[in-house]
Design a protein with these regions (language model features):
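Class I SAM-dependent methyltransferase SAM/SAH-binding core
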Residues: 1-42
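Hydrophobic adenine-recognition pocket in adenosine-nucleotide-binding enzymes
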Residues: 58
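Conserved S-adenosyl-L-methionine
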Residues: 118-128
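A short glycine-rich, Lys/Arg-flanked "PGG" loop and its adjoining helix->strand segment in the class I
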Residues: 66-78
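Acceptor-substrate binding/catalytic loop of class I
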Residues: 92-108, 130
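A conserved beta-strand element that flanks and buttresses the S-adenosyl-L-methionine
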Residues: 54
């Protein structure tokens, strides 16, 4: 996501729990700040507020997303936007899929965000291609309440 955001951003921070992913991001030379760390711990301990928070292909590694949503909310300004993607599952809640990634139901996302975010938009999308198959999901855009 960073490449797409660089031209419209005055400051770009990236957070990833994987040192390897941060090393790859460094090679792009587009970030002003890169942090190796857990997203919840990093955002919860920071006083920095962001205009736009983007978490594409992040929640697929997180089952219970409430603490992530709360940490993101803490890092929002009053007019911030929070954009994220999930692999959608039909059953309520979330579960570990055969792919070893988490799927989340639309209802789960809406329930977990109800008290801290308002939905701006959501779209069903093709998230990524694996082999010959597209992985379908959903992208949400929220603003803080």
């Amino acid at each position: 996501a960073g490449k797409s955001l660089r031209d419209i951003s005055s400051h770009l921070t990236g957070i990833d729990i994987s040192e390897n992913m941060i090393s790859e991001a460094l090679k792009l030379d587009i970030y002003d700040n890169l942090i190796v760390g857990d997203i919840v711990e990093t955002l919860s301990s920071s006083q920095e507020k962001f205009d736009l928070l983007v978490a594409l292909d992040v929640l697929i590694y997180i089952g219970d997303a409430l603490s992530t949503f709360q940490a993101v909310r803490k890092s929002c300004k009053s007019d911030s936007l929070f954009v994220f993607s999930v692999e959608i599952q039909e059953e309520d809640g979330y579960s570990l899929l055969k792919s070893s990634r988490y799927g989340h139901s639309d209802r789960y996302i809406m329930d977990q965000t109800a008290e801290i975010f308002d939905l701006v938009d959501s779209q069903n999308v093709r998230l990524r291609k694996e082999g010959d198959n597209w992985i379908n999901g959903k992208v949400y855009v929220f603003r803080p309440i």
